[in-house]
Each structure stands twice: as C-alpha cells, then as structure tokens.
C-alpha cells in the first residue's frame, strides 16, 4: 500500500495526457513541471484516499465507496468539485447499467439462437429417422413382394 508520494507513481502517459487536455493548444510544459504535477497528483490521491478511508472507518467498513470520496472532497474543502463528480458518477453508473443490459440481452439472444439451433437439429434428426423408417418399411414391402 502506498503511504508516501514516492510510493505512488502515476503513469507518466496519463499525467501528460491530463496536462495536455487542461492546457490550451500550443502551450508546452517542461519535464520538471510535469514531474511536479505528477508528485502533486500523487499527494492529492493519497490525501483524498486517507480522508475517504476515515469516512469508511466511521461507517465500520473496510471498503471505500463513492459517498466516502464525495464526503472527503467536502471535508478537504473541494466542494466545487462535488457536483461535477456526482454527475460523472451518475454518467458512469448509467454507462455500466447500459453495458450490463446489453450483455444480458446478448446472452439472451445467444441462448435463444442456441435453443433454435437445437430445435432445428432435433427436427432434422426426427426427419432423418422418419426417412429411415420409411426406407426400411419400403425395403420390407419389397422383400415381401
């Protein structure tokens, strides 16, 4: 578990992408500044996690949840981020729900298709069996004649 900023290294590619998205086009950032932002982000993540963990512990839980993080943001005096975070959380939940429903529908469609294929296979087997019975009966009739 990361307890110090040095223990937590956020991926440089992610930090660089976030920085580029936040800055206007044509603005460059030095390697030293990028490193400082990365360290600051690490400190923020550790601090936010620690505060959120306090809320989870008050609730006698070992698992942090979204409400713990939102409460931590308010406690850290980042209230202005709570509303956008809630909106992002709701969007995430809707997306997950949509994915789950799509997955369930895909499974139902596959099960239905499998069932139809099994029914078709059984029908073909029954038809083959009937044909064989007819052929045997015809052969028996020919032998009798």
Swiss-Prot record:
GO terms for molecular function: chromatin DNA binding; protein heterodimerization activity. Its main location: nucleus. Keywords: Acetylation, Coiled coil, DNA-binding, Nucleus, Phosphoprotein. The keyword Nucleus applies. The keyword Nucleus applies. The modification Phosphothreonine is found at residue 83. It is found in: Nucleus. GO terms for biological process: chromatin remodeling; DNA damage response; DNA-templated DNA replication; heterochromatin formation; leading strand elongation; negative regulation of transcription by RNA polymerase II; nucleosome assembly; regulation of DNA replication. GO terms for cellular component: ATAC complex; CHRAC; epsilon DNA polymerase complex; pericentric heterochromatin. It comes from the Eukaryota. The modification N-acetylalanine is found at residue 2. Residues 85-144 form a coiled coil. Residues 124-145 have a biased composition (Acidic residues). The modification Phosphoserine is found at residue 121. Residues 93-123 have a biased composition (Basic and acidic residues). Component of the DNA polymerase epsilon complex consisting of four subunits: the catalytic subunit POLE and the accessory subunits POLE2, POLE3 and POLE4. Interaction with POLE4 is a prerequisite for further binding with POLE and POLE2. Heterodimer with CHRAC1; binds to DNA. Component of the CHRAC ISWI chromatin remodeling complex at least composed of SMARCA5/SNF2H, BAZ1A/ACF1, CHRAC1 and POLE3; the complex preferentially binds DNA through the CHRAC1-POLE3 heterodimer and possesses ATP-dependent nucleosome-remodeling activity. Accessory component of the DNA polymerase epsilon complex. Participates in DNA repair and in chromosomal DNA replication. Forms a complex with CHRAC1 and binds naked DNA, which is then incorporated into chromatin, aided by the nucleosome-remodeling activity of ISWI/SNF2H and ACF1. Does not enhance nucleosome sliding activity of the ACF-5 ISWI chromatin remodeling complex. This is DNA polymerase epsilon subunit 3. It comes from Rattus norvegicus.
């Amino acid at each position: 578990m990361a307890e110090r900023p040095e223990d937590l290294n956020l991926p440089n590619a992610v930090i660089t992408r976030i920085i580029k998205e936040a800055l206007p086009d044509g603005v460059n950032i030095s390697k030293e500044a990028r490193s400082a932002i990365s360290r600051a982000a690490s400190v923020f993540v550790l601090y936010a996690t620690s505060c959120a963990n306090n809320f989870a512990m008050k609730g006698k839980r070992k698992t942090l949840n979204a409400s713990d993080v939102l409460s931590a943001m308010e406690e850290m005096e980042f209230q202005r981020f709570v509303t956008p975070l809630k909106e992002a959380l709701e969007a995430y939940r809707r997306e997950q729900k949509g994915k789950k429903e799509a997955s369930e529908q895909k499974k139902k469609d596959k099960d239905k298709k499998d069932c139809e294929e099994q029914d078709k296979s059984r029908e073909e087997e029954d038809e083959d069996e009937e044909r064989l019975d007819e052929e045997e009966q015809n052969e028996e009739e020919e032998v009798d004649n």
